[in-house]
Amino acid sequence: MKTKLFKTKKYTAMRKYLYILFALCMFLSSFGVWGQPNNTPVSLRWNNGGQAVKGDFIQIGNIRNFSTDAQSSATLKVPTHSSCLRVKWAGLYWSAYVPIGDRHDSRIEQVKFKMPGDTQFRDLRADVHMYSNFANSGDSYNCFKDVTSLLQSKGANFNNGEYTVSGIYSPNTIGSWGGWTLIVVYEDIQAATSKKIYIYDGAEWNFFNYNGTQTKTIPITGFQTPPAPAAIKARMGIFTGAGDRGTGYTSADEIRINEVKQGQNSNPNAYDDFMDESITYNHSEVAMPRNPNTRNHIDIDIFDIPNPGNTVINNGDTSLTIKFVASDAYITYTVALSVDAIAPLLI
């Protein structure tokens, strides 16, 4: 004898809820990571709780080496003669382009890391995984790992040494890029001034089409520069992907601080072609030792912001703006900024 299943009102309502749940799941899967938009906006990662640092930051990095399991290295050298340095904060980022089908691949969040004096790599897993999709053609991810304690364990030997990253996941497909950067905030008790330091990260395309020039502005607040007649100094570092050198989209590819263009007259980091696949320190590729020393659509640039007569950042300023202006698409992974600031006297 067969049992007949009666479709009660309760059963019908449950089936309706299941349909709604299924539709919601399909909607969420059209985003990046579940519940996360396809574009992870660049936002504040670290600013020392708003307190000034008697020191500054330094940034190094390199491309993903497609020929040797993505292994590449760069040399960190703090631009000071002080012998009294210590690590305040350090963050490692690795980023790459992957096909859409690989957006949830667990290998994305894993790399190998080697510091000065190490004889073996150590395995790292990302603390945060950010990513963005461009025109449904592929994904670009950005992974962050706090490595402060690792660098602090080196003492003063964190400086003047080679750092190596291996295993950045990215299939060898046409148009692929990948790379890593290490941002280190250091304290220097011999420093003449204190600085407010801001570290931003994300995975944010500056735009999603090629319909003219578009902009992205990051406001920086919460500091106060010293009073006159002090000369105000500031430093900026960036890590971006998908940049091109001289591709025809260079009529507007700029970084502006308080609306003043940054860069120089020619590549690398030309005023109108800043995102040009260069890895530089103060617009010099020679000043950023790395292996291999090649280009692959990755920009890692750290530079002191020219401020003649305090015409860009003035005495007593409490805010500034960083503006990205471009008619070529690129993705911003990290932005770092330091600026002279008044620090309270600690008794």
Predicted regions located by residue number:
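Disulfide-rich extracellular domains of secreted proteins
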Residues: W34-P344
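Short, intrinsically disordered, charge-balanced linker/junction segments flanking boundaries
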Residues: F6, L345-I347
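Bacterial Sec-dependent N-terminal signal peptides
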Residues: M1-P37
